[in-house]
Amino acid sequence: PVSCNWEAFSHLTDLVAKALAPHMSDKISAGHFLSIIGTIVGGIDDRTQEPFVLCEPQAGGWGGGINKDGESGLVAIDDGDTYIIPVEVAENKYPIIVEQYKFNTSSGAGKHRGGYGLVRDYRIDNSNAEITTIASRYRVAPWGANDGKEGSNNKIQVYTQNNMEEKATFSNDKLQKGDLIRFISGGGGGYGNPYERDVDMVLEDAL
């Protein structure tokens, strides 16, 4: 009953912030991607015949604030003690290939836009493996503040030879060599009216 309780703690923190935001708009930024997006990929490594377990969070976008855009590619509010595995370490230690690692530029518009989330792809380079994940904010996007727009949702996609499945959670789902896992973390909510955004900042966003 307490598994993945960090997701509940994160949402409680966010609930308080959202309730206070209309009354403290100069101190509280818009909503962020919120979820730790707990990621566990494991199995028996073909190279060593030893068990392997990749366990990490995913980073995402934070909400815009009164005087700045949201931060991009940071871990969630209740996740200060775990780390994203560097690409080189992940590929050396585990039977995976990191095929993509980039910003997800879908974030909430505003005078100060939300920060960007991330897209990270893992290609399974092992005869088989299993994946267990949890990502909240799959249905409800990060909220905008002071007339800012909503951010984007967290998504986990698994591509097999004949199918693509997108969910918020996977539990011991079987994978085979060549299957691809895509983690898409959401962008933060925007702060302030988007039409008040500085023209130079809009141009920078577009380029």
How would you describe each model-predicted region?
Residues P1-L207:
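Glycine/proline-enriched, intrinsically flexible loops and inter-domain linkers
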